[in-house]
Amino acid sequence: MKKTLILILCLFLCTVSFARKRVKVACVGNSITYGIGVSDPDKESYPARLQQMLGEGYTVERFGKPGATLLNKGHRPFMQQKEFKDALAFAGDVVVIHLGVNDTDPRDWPNYRDFFIADYRALIDSFRVANPECRILIARLTPIADRHPRFESGTRDWHDEIQLAIETIAKYAQVQLIDFHAPLYPYPFMLPDAVHPDKEGAAVLAKTVYEGITGDFGGLQMPEIYTDNMVLQHGRLLTIQGKADAGEKVTVSIDRQQLQAVTGADGKWAVDVRPLKAGGPYTLTVSTEKRKQVYENVLAGEVWLCSGQSNMEFYLNWSATAAQDVPQAANSNIRFYDMKARWRTDAVEWDASVLDSLNHLQYYKDTQWTVCS
Protein backbone atom coordinates (compact mmCIF):
# COMPACT_ATOMS: atom_id res chain seq x y z
CA MET A 1 0.00 0.00 0.00
CA LYS A 2 2.82 2.36 0.94
CA LYS A 3 4.62 1.65 -2.34
CA THR A 4 1.39 2.28 -4.24
CA LEU A 5 0.94 5.67 -2.56
CA ILE A 6 4.54 6.62 -3.31
CA LEU A 7 4.10 5.61 -6.96
CA ILE A 8 0.87 7.63 -7.27
CA LEU A 9 2.58 10.62 -5.66
CA CYS A 10 5.52 10.37 -8.07
CA LEU A 11 3.18 10.18 -11.05
CA PHE A 12 1.25 13.19 -9.76
CA LEU A 13 4.43 15.22 -9.29
CA CYS A 14 5.65 14.26 -12.76
CA THR A 15 2.31 15.34 -14.24
CA VAL A 16 2.45 18.67 -12.41
CA SER A 17 6.06 19.18 -13.49
CA PHE A 18 5.17 18.43 -17.11
CA ALA A 19 2.23 20.82 -17.01
CA ARG A 20 4.46 23.59 -15.69
CA LYS A 21 6.82 23.15 -18.63
CA ARG A 22 4.26 24.36 -21.14
CA VAL A 23 5.60 27.52 -22.76
CA LYS A 24 3.19 30.43 -22.48
CA VAL A 25 2.97 32.61 -25.59
CA ALA A 26 1.22 36.00 -25.37
CA CYS A 27 0.14 37.48 -28.71
CA VAL A 28 -0.30 41.21 -28.14
CA GLY A 29 -1.75 43.65 -30.64
CA ASN A 30 -4.74 45.24 -32.28
CA SER A 31 -7.68 43.97 -34.34
CA ILE A 32 -5.36 41.91 -36.53
CA THR A 33 -4.21 39.97 -33.47
CA TYR A 34 -7.81 39.76 -32.25
CA GLY A 35 -8.90 38.23 -35.54
CA ILE A 36 -11.01 40.85 -37.29
CA GLY A 37 -11.04 39.68 -40.90
CA VAL A 38 -11.70 35.99 -40.22
CA SER A 39 -15.09 34.41 -39.59
CA ASP A 40 -14.11 32.60 -36.37
CA PRO A 41 -11.31 34.34 -34.43
CA ASP A 42 -11.21 31.56 -31.83
CA LYS A 43 -10.16 29.10 -34.54
CA GLU A 44 -8.84 31.17 -37.45
CA SER A 45 -7.01 34.18 -35.97
CA TYR A 46 -3.25 34.01 -36.22
CA PRO A 47 -2.82 33.20 -32.48
CA ALA A 48 -5.32 30.33 -32.82
CA ARG A 49 -3.48 28.96 -35.84
CA LEU A 50 -0.19 29.41 -34.00
CA GLN A 51 -1.49 27.25 -31.16
CA GLN A 52 -2.31 24.51 -33.67
CA MET A 53 1.19 24.70 -35.14
CA LEU A 54 3.10 24.79 -31.85
CA GLY A 55 1.15 21.94 -30.31
CA GLU A 56 0.66 20.72 -26.76
CA GLY A 57 3.96 22.03 -25.40
CA TYR A 58 2.69 25.60 -25.69
CA THR A 59 -0.22 27.66 -24.43
CA VAL A 60 -1.02 30.55 -26.78
CA GLU A 61 -3.30 33.39 -25.68
CA ARG A 62 -4.36 36.39 -27.75
CA PHE A 63 -4.55 39.87 -26.31
CA GLY A 64 -5.77 41.89 -29.27
CA LYS A 65 -7.68 45.13 -28.85
CA PRO A 66 -9.39 46.41 -32.02
CA GLY A 67 -8.34 49.99 -32.75
CA ALA A 68 -5.47 49.96 -30.26
CA THR A 69 -2.51 52.27 -30.77
CA LEU A 70 1.02 51.84 -29.53
CA LEU A 71 1.23 55.55 -28.77
CA ASN A 72 0.12 56.35 -25.24
CA LYS A 73 -1.26 59.66 -26.51
CA GLY A 74 -3.04 57.95 -29.39
CA HIS A 75 -6.78 57.63 -29.79
CA ARG A 76 -6.90 54.20 -28.06
CA PRO A 77 -3.64 53.44 -26.23
CA PHE A 78 -3.06 49.71 -25.78
CA MET A 79 -1.44 50.23 -22.39
CA GLN A 80 -4.72 51.68 -21.10
CA GLN A 81 -6.81 48.69 -22.18
CA LYS A 82 -7.96 45.62 -20.25
CA GLU A 83 -6.11 43.44 -22.77
CA PHE A 84 -2.81 44.95 -21.62
CA LYS A 85 -3.54 44.17 -17.97
CA ASP A 86 -4.60 40.64 -18.89
CA ALA A 87 -1.41 40.13 -20.90
CA LEU A 88 0.74 41.25 -17.95
CA ALA A 89 -1.12 38.88 -15.63
CA PHE A 90 -0.55 36.04 -18.10
CA ALA A 91 3.23 36.67 -17.79
CA GLY A 92 4.12 34.93 -21.02
CA ASP A 93 7.42 33.16 -21.54
CA VAL A 94 7.23 34.47 -25.11
CA VAL A 95 5.57 37.78 -26.00
CA VAL A 96 4.75 38.60 -29.63
CA ILE A 97 3.88 42.26 -30.23
CA HIS A 98 2.27 43.67 -33.37
CA LEU A 99 1.24 47.28 -32.82
CA GLY A 100 1.50 50.44 -34.91
CA VAL A 101 -0.99 49.98 -37.75
CA ASN A 102 -3.59 52.18 -36.03
CA ASP A 103 -0.93 54.78 -35.24
CA THR A 104 -1.06 55.74 -38.93
CA ASP A 105 -4.30 57.56 -38.07
CA PRO A 106 -3.98 61.33 -38.70
CA ARG A 107 -4.94 61.88 -35.05
CA ASP A 108 -1.85 60.01 -33.91
CA TRP A 109 1.39 59.82 -35.87
CA PRO A 110 1.55 63.42 -37.13
CA ASN A 111 1.13 64.76 -33.59
CA TYR A 112 2.88 62.22 -31.37
CA ARG A 113 5.45 60.40 -33.52
CA ASP A 114 8.31 61.55 -31.29
CA PHE A 115 6.92 59.43 -28.44
CA PHE A 116 6.65 56.19 -30.41
CA ILE A 117 10.03 54.66 -29.58
CA ALA A 118 9.83 55.60 -25.90
CA ASP A 119 6.28 54.23 -25.63
CA TYR A 120 7.28 50.97 -27.33
CA ARG A 121 10.23 50.62 -24.95
CA ALA A 122 7.87 51.16 -22.02
CA LEU A 123 5.59 48.39 -23.31
CA ILE A 124 8.52 46.00 -23.69
CA ASP A 125 9.81 46.85 -20.21
CA SER A 126 6.38 46.16 -18.74
CA PHE A 127 6.46 42.58 -20.00
CA ARG A 128 10.01 42.16 -18.75
CA VAL A 129 8.89 43.20 -15.28
CA ALA A 130 5.97 40.75 -15.43
CA ASN A 131 8.35 37.94 -16.44
CA PRO A 132 12.07 38.83 -16.31
CA GLU A 133 12.89 35.69 -18.31
CA CYS A 134 10.45 36.36 -21.14
CA ARG A 135 11.53 36.36 -24.76
CA ILE A 136 10.06 39.19 -26.81
CA LEU A 137 9.42 39.29 -30.55
CA ILE A 138 8.18 42.47 -32.22
CA ALA A 139 6.72 42.47 -35.70
CA ARG A 140 7.15 44.79 -38.64
CA LEU A 141 3.70 46.04 -39.58
CA THR A 142 1.37 44.12 -41.84
CA PRO A 143 0.76 45.94 -45.15
CA ILE A 144 -1.91 48.55 -45.73
CA ALA A 145 -3.14 48.17 -49.31
CA ASP A 146 -3.58 51.05 -51.71
CA ARG A 147 -7.37 50.61 -51.51
CA HIS A 148 -7.31 52.17 -48.05
CA PRO A 149 -9.14 55.54 -48.19
CA ARG A 150 -6.26 57.40 -46.50
CA PHE A 151 -3.48 55.58 -48.35
CA GLU A 152 -2.30 58.59 -50.36
CA SER A 153 -3.14 61.24 -47.78
CA GLY A 154 -0.39 60.31 -45.37
CA THR A 155 -1.07 56.74 -44.28
CA ARG A 156 1.38 55.16 -46.74
CA ASP A 157 4.27 57.42 -45.70
CA TRP A 158 3.50 57.21 -41.98
CA HIS A 159 3.33 53.43 -42.27
CA ASP A 160 6.86 53.43 -43.73
CA GLU A 161 8.13 55.71 -40.97
CA ILE A 162 6.68 53.44 -38.29
CA GLN A 163 8.39 50.44 -39.89
CA LEU A 164 11.75 52.18 -39.51
CA ALA A 165 10.97 53.05 -35.91
CA ILE A 166 10.14 49.41 -35.14
CA GLU A 167 13.45 48.27 -36.62
CA THR A 168 15.24 50.81 -34.41
CA ILE A 169 13.38 49.56 -31.34
CA ALA A 170 14.33 45.95 -32.06
CA LYS A 171 17.98 46.90 -32.25
CA TYR A 172 18.23 48.99 -29.11
CA ALA A 173 15.75 47.07 -26.95
CA GLN A 174 17.53 43.84 -27.92
CA VAL A 175 14.40 41.99 -28.95
CA GLN A 176 13.83 39.71 -31.91
CA LEU A 177 12.41 41.32 -35.04
CA ILE A 178 10.00 39.32 -37.18
CA ASP A 179 8.45 40.45 -40.44
CA PHE A 180 4.68 40.60 -40.90
CA HIS A 181 5.03 42.82 -43.97
CA ALA A 182 7.06 40.90 -46.56
CA PRO A 183 5.06 37.63 -46.47
CA LEU A 184 1.74 39.42 -47.11
CA TYR A 185 2.80 42.29 -49.37
CA PRO A 186 2.71 40.33 -52.67
CA TYR A 187 -0.81 39.08 -51.95
CA PRO A 188 -3.23 42.03 -51.65
CA PHE A 189 -6.20 39.68 -52.05
CA MET A 190 -5.42 38.41 -48.53
CA LEU A 191 -6.33 41.90 -47.26
CA PRO A 192 -9.95 42.21 -48.47
CA ASP A 193 -10.57 45.47 -46.60
CA ALA A 194 -7.02 46.74 -47.24
CA VAL A 195 -5.99 46.20 -43.59
CA HIS A 196 -7.13 42.92 -42.02
CA PRO A 197 -5.77 39.58 -43.26
CA ASP A 198 -8.31 36.94 -44.17
CA LYS A 199 -8.11 33.30 -43.07
CA GLU A 200 -5.24 32.55 -45.44
CA GLY A 201 -3.40 35.72 -44.45
CA ALA A 202 -3.77 34.87 -40.76
CA ALA A 203 -2.21 31.48 -41.47
CA VAL A 204 0.74 33.27 -43.10
CA LEU A 205 1.23 35.36 -39.95
CA ALA A 206 0.99 32.26 -37.75
CA LYS A 207 3.69 30.57 -39.82
CA THR A 208 5.91 33.64 -39.49
CA VAL A 209 5.57 33.64 -35.70
CA TYR A 210 6.05 29.87 -35.55
CA GLU A 211 9.31 30.18 -37.45
CA GLY A 212 10.43 33.06 -35.25
CA ILE A 213 9.75 31.17 -32.03
CA THR A 214 11.03 27.72 -33.01
CA GLY A 215 13.67 28.60 -35.61
CA ASP A 216 12.12 25.90 -37.81
CA PHE A 217 12.16 27.18 -41.39
CA GLY A 218 11.96 23.74 -42.99
CA GLY A 219 15.68 23.03 -43.17
CA LEU A 220 18.09 23.80 -46.00
CA GLN A 221 16.41 25.28 -49.06
CA MET A 222 17.87 26.82 -52.20
CA PRO A 223 16.18 29.12 -54.72
CA GLU A 224 14.53 27.29 -57.63
CA ILE A 225 17.08 28.68 -60.07
CA TYR A 226 19.77 26.43 -58.55
CA THR A 227 19.80 23.18 -60.59
CA ASP A 228 22.28 20.94 -62.39
CA ASN A 229 23.77 22.50 -65.56
CA MET A 230 23.40 26.05 -64.24
CA VAL A 231 25.69 28.97 -65.10
CA LEU A 232 27.27 31.18 -62.43
CA GLN A 233 28.67 34.59 -63.29
CA HIS A 234 32.44 34.44 -63.65
CA GLY A 235 35.07 37.01 -62.78
CA ARG A 236 33.34 38.72 -59.85
CA LEU A 237 32.46 38.16 -56.22
CA LEU A 238 29.45 35.87 -56.21
CA THR A 239 26.86 35.72 -53.42
CA ILE A 240 25.22 32.34 -52.89
CA GLN A 241 22.30 32.40 -50.50
CA GLY A 242 19.36 30.37 -49.27
CA LYS A 243 17.34 29.39 -46.23
CA ALA A 244 17.86 26.97 -43.35
CA ASP A 245 16.82 26.58 -39.75
CA ALA A 246 17.92 29.38 -37.42
CA GLY A 247 21.42 28.83 -36.08
CA GLU A 248 22.21 26.04 -38.57
CA LYS A 249 25.72 26.05 -39.99
CA VAL A 250 25.77 25.96 -43.81
CA THR A 251 28.81 24.88 -45.82
CA VAL A 252 29.23 25.85 -49.48
CA SER A 253 31.93 24.19 -51.61
CA ILE A 254 32.98 24.94 -55.18
CA ASP A 255 36.31 25.00 -57.05
CA ARG A 256 38.49 24.25 -53.98
CA GLN A 257 36.67 26.93 -51.99
CA GLN A 258 34.83 25.97 -48.82
CA LEU A 259 32.83 28.67 -47.11
CA GLN A 260 30.60 28.61 -44.06
CA ALA A 261 27.76 30.71 -42.73
CA VAL A 262 25.48 30.53 -39.72
CA THR A 263 21.80 30.97 -40.50
CA GLY A 264 20.24 34.04 -38.91
CA ALA A 265 17.12 34.21 -36.77
CA ASP A 266 15.20 35.06 -39.96
CA GLY A 267 16.17 31.76 -41.58
CA LYS A 268 18.47 33.38 -44.14
CA TRP A 269 22.15 32.75 -44.84
CA ALA A 270 24.65 33.90 -47.48
CA VAL A 271 28.29 33.39 -48.44
CA ASP A 272 30.51 35.27 -50.89
CA VAL A 273 32.42 33.05 -53.32
CA ARG A 274 35.66 34.44 -54.69
CA PRO A 275 35.60 35.08 -58.45
CA LEU A 276 35.43 31.90 -60.52
CA LYS A 277 37.39 31.42 -63.72
CA ALA A 278 35.29 31.04 -66.83
CA GLY A 279 34.81 27.40 -67.69
CA GLY A 280 34.17 24.28 -65.71
CA PRO A 281 32.39 22.04 -65.21
CA TYR A 282 32.22 22.66 -61.47
CA THR A 283 30.33 20.90 -58.71
CA LEU A 284 28.50 23.14 -56.26
CA THR A 285 27.72 21.56 -52.89
CA VAL A 286 25.56 23.19 -50.23
CA SER A 287 25.09 21.28 -46.99
CA THR A 288 24.02 21.36 -43.37
CA GLU A 289 24.31 18.65 -40.76
CA LYS A 290 20.89 17.31 -41.81
CA ARG A 291 20.75 17.91 -45.57
CA LYS A 292 22.98 18.17 -48.62
CA GLN A 293 22.26 19.54 -52.08
CA VAL A 294 24.71 18.88 -54.91
CA TYR A 295 24.60 20.62 -58.29
CA GLU A 296 26.60 18.97 -61.08
CA ASN A 297 27.92 20.18 -64.43
CA VAL A 298 27.93 23.83 -63.37
CA LEU A 299 29.69 26.36 -65.60
CA ALA A 300 31.13 29.79 -64.82
CA GLY A 301 30.47 32.25 -67.62
CA GLU A 302 28.29 35.14 -68.72
CA VAL A 303 24.73 35.15 -67.40
CA TRP A 304 22.25 37.03 -69.59
CA LEU A 305 18.70 37.88 -68.55
CA CYS A 306 16.35 38.05 -71.53
CA SER A 307 12.85 39.38 -71.01
CA GLY A 308 10.23 40.99 -73.18
CA GLN A 309 7.00 40.51 -75.10
CA SER A 310 5.58 37.54 -76.96
CA ASN A 311 8.39 37.69 -79.52
CA MET A 312 10.70 36.37 -76.79
CA GLU A 313 8.78 33.09 -77.12
CA PHE A 314 9.70 32.75 -80.79
CA TYR A 315 11.09 29.29 -81.52
CA LEU A 316 14.08 28.96 -83.79
CA ASN A 317 12.35 26.23 -85.77
CA TRP A 318 9.65 28.76 -86.70
CA SER A 319 12.14 30.87 -88.64
CA ALA A 320 12.46 30.83 -92.42
CA THR A 321 16.05 29.59 -92.11
CA ALA A 322 15.33 26.92 -89.49
CA ALA A 323 16.93 24.14 -91.51
CA GLN A 324 20.28 25.94 -91.42
CA ASP A 325 20.00 27.51 -87.95
CA VAL A 326 18.80 24.65 -85.76
CA PRO A 327 21.79 22.33 -86.35
CA GLN A 328 24.10 25.14 -85.20
CA ALA A 329 22.28 25.50 -81.89
CA ALA A 330 23.89 22.43 -80.31
CA ASN A 331 26.54 23.79 -77.93
CA SER A 332 27.18 22.20 -74.55
CA ASN A 333 28.75 25.43 -73.30
CA ILE A 334 25.45 27.28 -73.65
CA ARG A 335 22.84 26.68 -70.97
CA PHE A 336 19.21 27.76 -71.00
CA TYR A 337 16.78 28.47 -68.16
CA ASP A 338 13.44 28.87 -69.91
CA MET A 339 10.55 30.17 -67.79
CA LYS A 340 7.40 29.32 -69.74
CA ALA A 341 4.08 30.89 -68.80
CA ARG A 342 1.46 28.61 -67.26
CA TRP A 343 -1.29 30.45 -69.12
CA ARG A 344 -1.26 32.49 -72.30
CA THR A 345 -2.59 36.04 -72.34
CA ASP A 346 -4.83 35.46 -75.33
CA ALA A 347 -8.33 36.89 -75.64
CA VAL A 348 -9.94 34.03 -73.73
CA GLU A 349 -11.71 33.95 -70.38
CA TRP A 350 -9.80 32.33 -67.52
CA ASP A 351 -11.66 30.21 -65.00
CA ALA A 352 -11.51 30.77 -61.24
CA SER A 353 -8.69 28.28 -60.69
CA VAL A 354 -6.42 30.23 -63.04
CA LEU A 355 -7.20 33.49 -61.25
CA ASP A 356 -6.43 31.82 -57.91
CA SER A 357 -3.07 30.61 -59.22
CA LEU A 358 -2.20 34.04 -60.57
CA ASN A 359 -3.15 35.65 -57.26
CA HIS A 360 -0.62 33.30 -55.66
CA LEU A 361 2.03 34.44 -58.19
CA GLN A 362 2.16 31.06 -59.93
CA TYR A 363 2.93 32.60 -63.30
CA TYR A 364 5.47 30.15 -64.67
CA LYS A 365 5.84 26.41 -65.13
CA ASP A 366 8.51 24.58 -63.17
CA THR A 367 11.76 24.43 -65.09
CA GLN A 368 15.50 23.82 -64.78
CA TRP A 369 18.75 24.65 -66.53
CA THR A 370 19.29 22.61 -69.71
CA VAL A 371 22.24 22.11 -72.04
CA CYS A 372 21.47 23.63 -75.43
CA SER A 373 21.06 21.07 -78.17
Where are these regions (language model features)?
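Extended acidic/polar, glycine-enriched regions
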Residues: 241-321
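Structural beta-strand segments of beta-rich domains
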Residues: 228, 236-240
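Conserved SGNH/GDSL esterase-like catalytic core that processes O-acyl groups on lipids
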Residues: 22-27, 32-121, 276, 297, ...
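Bacterial Sec-dependent N-terminal signal peptides
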Residues: 1-21
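Proline/serine/threonine-rich low-complexity linkers at boundaries of modular beta-sandwich domains
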Residues: 217-222
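A conserved hydrophobic secondary-structure block that centers on an alpha-helix together
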Residues: 357-373
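C-terminal catalytic domains of large/alpha subunits in multi-subunit enzymes
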Residues: 327-343, 348-361
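Alpha-helical cap/lid subdomain in secreted, periplasmic
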Residues: 1, 20-21, 52, 56, ...
